[in-house]
Amino acid sequence: MEIGENKILETNDFDIAKSKQYHLSLRIGIDNFSFSILDTVTLSYNYLVVNYFTYISIKDTVKKITSIIKNNNLFQLNFSSSSLIYSGFPNTLLPKELENSTNEKKLLEFNDDKCYEKIYFDIIDNIKIIYSIPETVDNITKTFFPTCKTMSEEKIFLEKKIYRDLSTCV
């Protein structure tokens, strides 16, 4: 693997001509943007880019992420699939039974003093994860990655925890 100045890892097997057999995974946070490329045939990660930056404002974060996307030709490729994780944004958990009786925005504000304009949720078994992201960050997703499957980072953590607990019970 070759390591570059911008925290880039690339295997010798990486070939942009094979983009149709690759899955693009993205992660957007308040102070970071990273992505990796998985070869769905060999099930190996062939490319990884990690960008951390000092948080100044949402506007500045969006500007930095947009610049990274626009200046990387990999985002012009056609991938077999793509997914995006929102990381570190305000979130809370709610039992699924209560989902229709509660104002999601008020719940988020109760749990975290920040609540952004866009409110989304993920469901895992009987748990509802409610999270919010800034509208400008949401616009990045819709503009550059309109077909991306999106979810909160907490969903992945909880799924792994639930799966691990279930596998130890068997």
Q: What are the residue ranges of the model-derived segments?
A:
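Nucleic-acid-processing active sites and adjacent nucleic-acid-binding tracks
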Residues: 46-68
